[in-house]
Every structure is written in structure tokens, then in C-alpha cells.
């Protein structure tokens, strides 16, 4: 969000600050209004009409100005902090560089001084050893003088070291001088106490200790004065001289040892300073001063302290000095000569120990430097290697972490996947085998069911013989004697059997020979027959329990392609119980039938088509579905050259309607309208002109004759009328007219007819009763 003056902040932060600013401003304004109201109520002044508002500047402008000023102040503070941090970093770096340079310079100088001191001390040692045999006082004084000079030189070197360490940088000069002065004061105080304790030994020893204290407290320019004082001192007694020598040697050893330790500490602290960028030379010096102070507090400590390690040469030298001391003590030498030899021997041993300690410290320092540099190089190489590995192995590390976090779940998931694959393969194989077995089982079951249904149906199908009947099972078929057909037991009541068959099978004979599947025969009686439906009912009596009543199905639910079985007796008794298999080839077929064999079709039979094998003798046989239920009765087949397996069966629902009336009445009552008709398709051109038939009319019937007082006459139908539609159905010919009229045999309701009379179209209602 741009608020001006080159300040850009996020929109959410801008809205939050604006909301807080408005809230605070409204609260302040409400408080002011409340306070002004109290003042007005108390003073009852005329200031009640005073407008209590802030300036006319818009709230948003005030908020933007306030926010921009706040951001400017914050930026200034940030810049100042950055400047101070950069300055402090530069100062620390410069101070560190100076201290580091001074530390290196001091260490180099100290190494050179140590080497020079070792050479001088060795030469002096050999000279003093050669001069130790002398027993004169002059040589003893010379040796004592040289010893004092050596101690003064050591003190000078110590003061020079302290002086060099005290001026590493101008930045820390004042603080370091203060710390040194405080430490020297503490050292001087400790030395003063020691002097007071030893005051009983004589004025010479006290004067000498005060001079030593003054040497430690004085600065570098006063070293020459201390040397003069030492040279001008009076000779000391033997106990005082031994005590002084021992104290000086201890101080020198302590300085050398602490300096070596401080050098190692400086190196270790220098490594830490590289990571923190903070100089640490002053701290190392403080540690050195503290160690010196602690050691000086115990002047009586022996040289053989646990912190100092003696070499084999030192031990041999000590033993030699001890033997010489005993020898000199037992000798009849003077007290001065014994004193000088003993002081010389102790001085030599002290120098030897100092040399060995310095060598040991230098060796430790070199080892420490080598280890430090090696560690630094190793750290650098390790850091580079780690960076390279981190860059190259970042992805592998992520994968390892992911695996370590989720490996149980991943293992379980992999196991589940493998198990699913295995089970899938197993189940696929099993399912394949099951499907094969199911197919085989289905085929076996289908075959078993077919066989079962066939066996059950055979028990319900009988042979019907009529010697006087004529063959009329097919259109234009020649008449023959000794007709044999089939029948179906559709009902059984006790020993009474009701058999349905075709009307053309029973013919004109009332009695029929009924033969069962077990070759037993009985005589049956025809209860009724209907030539228009080609159905007849025969009643027979038999106590044979093998004869079964067939189960009735529903022909309204037939499906095209549905498998069926046909059971009958083709060609007579010799082939009784023949079973053929097929499917339903067609539904709602209108098959023309010639019952009286006059080469003229008499009726349209409503049937369904099957492709099962049907032969003479199958008429009246049973058509069952795969459940073994009766769905039709075989009625006819087309017997023409080049035509095969085209047979027809009457639906069982139509059969039930007919046999019910035949069983009770013996006949079927159809409505008769009392007319005779001709088909339009058979008219010639003169006949079409006579009835004034429009040219567009191609199908229908022409009324040729109307019976007086008949249903047609009562309905107003006249000769010459052309009927093209009946009961809402297209009328093709006179067979279709009879089929539509006979379909209303049960309700006998009036039906509508569309006719042409004198070339004009009109509708009339035809009565059926």
C-alpha cells in the first residue's frame, strides 16, 4: 500500500494500523466530549454550543501523515543501529588485528630471549663449575655478583615482557595499565608481608626484599637503578643468601612456567576469538598475572612441585649437587667457602632447571601451535566437504528423513500392495476357473433343466387319434384319412382329465382315442370345438398316476429369442413324446387359415412364431418355456418348398379364454353383423368407379350385401359403403374385419368405422349386440 513519501507497506498492515488509529482517535474524541460536557454542567457556561471536533483534515489524511512519520522515524533508527554495528565491527576487527600482531611479536621476541638466555646461562654454568673449586673469597664474591646480575637480568626480561604485553593497543591501554598496577600492588603487598615475617633474619635480608619489591613495582626505566643497588649491597649471611636464592629461583620458574601456559592459553583463546571476533590478549595476560600472584603467595614451595616435571638430567644433577654439598659441609673449609660453594651449586641447579623448563614449555608451545594449525586446516577442509556433501546429498537426506519418519507406514503400504497383487492374481485365476466352471455348470444346469422340463412335459402330452378327420393343419393341405395329432392335459380333477387340442385334429368325431406316454389308451369325449380359433376340448378318465397336469405360464411376457421346447407325437404313436428345441422367432403374427379346404382363407389366427422342428402329428402339442410352463399350443406350420422351421403356436392366454367356454358351453358365441364384403384389392376399375372410390384408397372392404334388420342394417351401414378403418385400426381385408369383430366377443360394445359413401368420407357406429 503506497502512503506517500516513498513508503510502501502491505495492505493488511495498512488496514490494521488505520483501524487502530481511527479507534484511538474516536476514543479520545469521546473522552474530550464527555469531559467538556462535565465542565459545561459544572460551570453552566455558554460554551455548550461549542463544536467539539478536531481539525477539518480528513481522518485518512491524518492517519497517512501519522503513519508516514512513524515509518520515517523507524527507518532512521534502523540506519543508525546499522551504522553503529558496522563501526563496532570495524573497531573490533582492527583491535583484534593489532593484538594478534603484538602477540606474535611478543612470542617471537620471547623465543629469541629464551635462546640467548640459555646460551649465556650454559656458558656461565660451565665457568662457575670450573671456578667452584676455588676457595678464595674474591672468587666467591665474583660468583655471587654474577648470580645477582643474572637474577637482575631475569627481572629485566620479566619487566620487558610485562612492558611489551602492557602496550598491545592504544584502545585498551588505560584498562591494562590499571590492571597491571593493581596486580603489582597486590604483589608488593604480599612481598611486604613476607618481608615482615622474615624481619628477624636481619636488616640485610629486609633491605634486599624491599629492593626486590621495588624492582617489581618500578617501570622499565628504573631497571638500571635496581641493578646498581644490587651490586652495592653488603654480603649476606648464609641462611639469608640461601633463602633469597631459593625465592628468586622459584619466581623465575613460576614466570617461565606461567608464561608457557599463557602462551598456550593465548593460542586456544585466539582460536575462540576467530569465531567471536573479540580480542583476548588482555584476558591471557590477566591469567598470567593471577598465576604469578598465586605462586608468589607461597614462597616456601619447593622446586619439585607436581606441576613441574623433572628430566633424568635434572635428577642426576640434583644428586651430584647433594653429594657435593655434603662433601663440602664435612670438609675443613671455611664458612665462607662452604657458603659460596653451596650457593653456587644451588644457583647452577636453578639455572639448569630453568633451562629444562623453558625447553619443555617451548616444545609444548610448538606442539600446541602445530595441533592448532592442523585443527584449523582440518576444520576448514571439513566445512568445505560438508558444504559439498550438503549440496550433493540434500535430496538423499530428505529421502532418508522421510524414510525414517514414515518407514513403518511405507512397509505396511508395500505389504498391502504386494498382498493385493497376489490376491488379485489368485482371485483372477479362481474367478477364471469359476467362470469356466459356472459356464460348464450353467450348461449342465441348462441341460438338466431342459431334460427335467422335457420329462415333465412328456407326462402331460398325449396322443389324439381321429380316423375320420381331415388334415387341415396347414393352408391348402390335402385331406387325408386316419389323422393323428397331439393334446395337452391342462387340468386334472381326480381321475378326470381335460385335454386341449386343435379343432382340425378331432374333426367331426365326438369320441377320440387318447394314448398316454406309458402306452396306455383310453377313449375321450369332445366337449367342444371352435373352428375360428382351431381349438377343441376332450374329456377323458384315467386312474394312471403317471399322467400329470401341466403348469400354465403367461404368454403376455414372451420375449423374442426366448428358448422353448416343443413336445408332441409326430407321425403317430410310434414317435410319441418327441422333444424338439428352439426359440421364439416372432410375436403377434396374423396367420391366415383355410379350415374347409376350399382354397379360400377363412380366418386370421393370432399366434407367435417358433423355429423348433414341427411335423405332421405335432398339431395340438405343447410349447413350454425354460421353466417347463405351457406358453402355447402348436397350431400350424408352413409347408412349402424352400421353407423350413416356420411354425406357429396359439398363445396360452387366448387358449384359456377359449377352452373355458368350450368346457362349459361346448362352443364360442361370436357377434354377427349380417354383412358380406369384398376386398378393395380384388376390385377392377369399373367396380371402383361404380362405388366412386377415391384413387388414394388402396385397402379396405366394400359392403356387398346387408341383411335386413341385422346389426349392420341397424347401424346404418349400406350396400356400396367402403370401410377403410375399424375400431381405430387400419382395415386391410375381410379377414381382418372378422378378426376385429370377433375380438369383442366378450364385451360386445359398439365400434367406430370410417367409411366412404358416394365418394364422401364419414363415420358410423356399428353395433355388436
From Swiss-Prot:
Pfam families: PDZ_2, Trypsin_2
UniProt-annotated catalytic positions: 504 (charge relay system), 534 (charge relay system), 619 (charge relay system)
Main subcellular location of this protein, as a coarse class: membrane
Membrane-spanning ranges: 410-430
Biased composition (Basic and acidic residues): 21-64, 71-108, 138-186, 264-296, 310-330, 348-364
Biased composition range(s): Polar residues: 126-137, 247-262, 331-347, 365-390
Biased composition (Basic residues): 1-20
CDD domains given in the database record: cpPDZ_BsHtra-like (cd06781)
Location within or outside the cell: Cell membrane
Molecular function per GO: serine-type endopeptidase activity
InterPro entries on file: Chloro_Bact_Ser_Proteases, PDZ, PDZ_sf, Peptidase_S1_PA, Peptidase_S1_PA_chymotrypsin, Peptidase_S1C
Annotated SMART domains: PDZ
Keywords carried by this UniProt record: Cell membrane, Hydrolase, Membrane, Protease, Serine protease, Transmembrane, Transmembrane helix
Any one GO BP annotation for this protein: proteolysis
Membrane topology: Single-pass membrane protein
Protein family per UniProt: Belongs to the peptidase S1C family.
Classification via PANTHER family: PEPTIDASE S12 (PTHR43343), PROTEASE DO-LIKE 8, CHLOROPLASTIC (PTHR43343:SF3)
Protein's UniProt name: Serine protease HtrA-like
Organism of provenance: Staphylococcus aureus (strain COL)
